[in-house]
Amino acid sequence: MTQQQRGVVQSIAGPAVIASGMYGAKMYDIVRVGKERLVGEIIRLEGNTAFVQVYEDTSGLTVGEPVETTGLPLSVELGPGMLNGIYDGIQRPLDKIREASGDFIARGIEVSSLDRTKKWAFTPTVQAGDTVGGSSILGTVPEFSFTHKILTPPDKGGRLTWVAPAGEYTIDDTIATLEDGTNLRLAHYWPVRAPRPVAQKLDPSQPFLTGMRILDVLFPLVMGGTAAIPGPFGSGKTVTQQSVAKYGNADIVVYVGCGERGNEMTDVLVEFPELEDPKTGGPLMHRTILIANTSNMPVAAREASVYTGITLAEYFRDQGYSVSLMADSTSRWAEALREISSRLEEMPAEEGYPPYLGAKLAAFYERAGAVKTLAGEDGAVSVIGAVSPAGGDMSEPVTQATLRITGAFWRLDAGLARRRHFPAINWNGSYSLFTPILDSWYRENVGRDFPELRQRISNLLQQEASLQEVVQLVGPDALQDQERLVIETGRMLRQDFLQQNGFDPVDASASMPKNYGLMKMMLKFYDEAEAALRNGVGIDEIIQNPVIEKLSRARYVPEADFMAYAESVMDELDTTFKGVKA
C-alpha cells in the first residue's frame, strides 16, 4: 500500500465518512476505514477528498484514523460452493462469520466468500490449443444434483497452453493457462456494479411459471422479464415471493432479503431446507442462494446487496441457466439510497429521495433479460422486486419509478389479505405487458382457445366487481337473474380458481394443463347456466345445483386424477342443465 493511497478520516456522519488525502483513489474503490479496517466504498470524489459509504457500523470511529484504498471495486467471487449458501450484502458467508465472531457480526471481520479447502471434481471440456473467449466453459463440476459450469472471466480470453486433467481441485488451484500467462481457476472475481457482458439480448418467448393461477393465467411473466409486487404492510409480499421461489420454473433462485425483518429470513432458512425440489427431489436450498441483509444490519450494505444478488444471478445465467432473483424489498434499498444521499448533503427530490432514484432502479431492473451468452448458451434472469409503499400509497416515488420500468405489476391488496385470500393479488389493479407476447406459446402448449378463455374470465371478474358496488348500495334482490349469475360465477372464479391454499400439497402449486381444465369447467358452467336462464329456469335453482360443489372441489384433485375428474364434471354439467331445460 503506497502512501498516496492512504488518507485520514476527516468527518463521520453515520455510514458516510469523508476522507482527505486520498490521492490516486478511484470511484467505487473498496477502502478499509479506521484501525478496525471497516469495509467501505468510495461513492464520490472531489480532488483528493473521498466520500465513503461504510458497510459496517461506524460507532467508535474517530477523526484522524487511517483510510486505505485497495484499488479494486466491490467484487464478488463466483465459483462452485455458492449454492445452499447464505451471505450478507457484500458476499460474506454468515455461517463462517458466526464461527468467527458469534451470533452478531463483528466489525472489520474478513472471511472468504467460498470454501478454499473443499476439493471439487473437475472434468475439462476443452484441451490445450483451444481458443476460448470471455465466459467460455472450461469444464464442469458437480454441485449437489446441479452441473456447475466453470467459466473464464468475461474479460479474459485467448489460446489455452495447458488444461488440468480431470481430478479434484480447490478453487485456488490453477485449472488452465492462457497464452499470455494468465492462470485460470475454478472461481473468478467480478465487480457487482458492472453488468456481465452478453453476445445479444433475445426476445422473450417462454413463460416464467410460478404455480399461482392468478399470475400464470391472468398476469404472466416471461422468462427474463421483470415484475413488481407492491403492497402495504401485511399484504403478503414476502409470502408471495417465497411461494414463487419455491414453485417457479427457474433453475436457480437468488433470494435477496434487503432491509426486511430478520424473522422473515429465518423463516426462509428454516423452511427451504425442508422443502422438496419438484425438479430433483432434493432440498430446495440446493439450488438457492440467500442474501440476508436484515433491517438491523448497516444501511449502506442494503444498497450493495441487490447488486451482489444480480451479479450472482448473471453468473449462473452465463452458464445457460434460467435464474429468478427475488428482491425483498426494493423500498428498503431506496431508503438506504435516501439516507446516504442526505448524509452527503445532496439535493433531495420528491419525498427526500435522491434525483437519481429512477436511474438507479432502471439500471438494476435492466440487468434482467433473456440472453445469448458469450459462450453461445441461452440463459435468462427474471427479476421480481417487492415494493413497500408507506401506508399503501401507490403514488409514492419508488412505486411510480418501478411501475415505469417493470413489465408486470402484481398489486397486493390488504383487504384480500385480511379476508385470508391467498395470493392477495388484486385482479382489477394488476396488469402484465407480456400477455400478448405469450399468447402463441399458450396456444401451442396449453390450448388453442386459451387466450380467449382468459379474456372471458377477466371480463367476468370486471363485471362482478361493478355489480358488487350495486349490491352494496341496494342489495342483491335488485339485480336481474342474469346479473346474479355473473355474481355467482365471479364468486366461483375468486374462491375456487384465483384463491389457492398454500398449506395444501395439491393446491399450493398448479400446472398449466390443470389451470386450463379449471377455466373450461368454470366457463362451461356459466354458458350452460346462462342457456338455462333463457329457457325459464330460476336463478335460485341454478345456484343450489350440487354440481357447484364439485366445481369448488376440483382444485384439490391431484394432477394424476384431474383429467378424469374434469371430464366427469363436464359431462355432468351437460346432463344436469339438459335435465333442467327439459
Curated annotation (Swiss-Prot):
GO terms for molecular function: ATP binding; proton-transporting ATP synthase activity, rotational mechanism; proton-transporting ATPase activity, rotational mechanism. It is an enzyme of class 7 (translocase). GO terms for biological process: proton motive force-driven plasma membrane ATP synthesis. Keywords: ATP synthesis, ATP-binding, Hydrogen ion transport, Ion transport, Nucleotide-binding, Translocase, Transport. ATP binds at residues 231-238. Its EC number is 7.1.2.2. Pfam families: ATP-synt_ab, ATP-synt_ab_N, ATP-synt_ab_Xtn, ATP-synt_VA_C. One of its GO terms (cellular component) is proton-transporting ATP synthase complex. It comes from the Bacteria. The keyword Nucleotide-binding applies. It catalyses: ATP + H2O + 4 H(+)(in) = ADP + phosphate + 5 H(+)(out). Transmembrane segments: none annotated. NCBIfam families: PRK04192.1. Belongs to the ATPase alpha/beta chains family. Produces ATP from ADP in the presence of a proton gradient across the membrane. The V-type alpha chain is a catalytic subunit. PANTHER family: H(+)-TRANSPORTING TWO-SECTOR ATPASE, V-TYPE PROTON ATPASE CATALYTIC SUBUNIT A. This is V-type ATP synthase alpha chain.
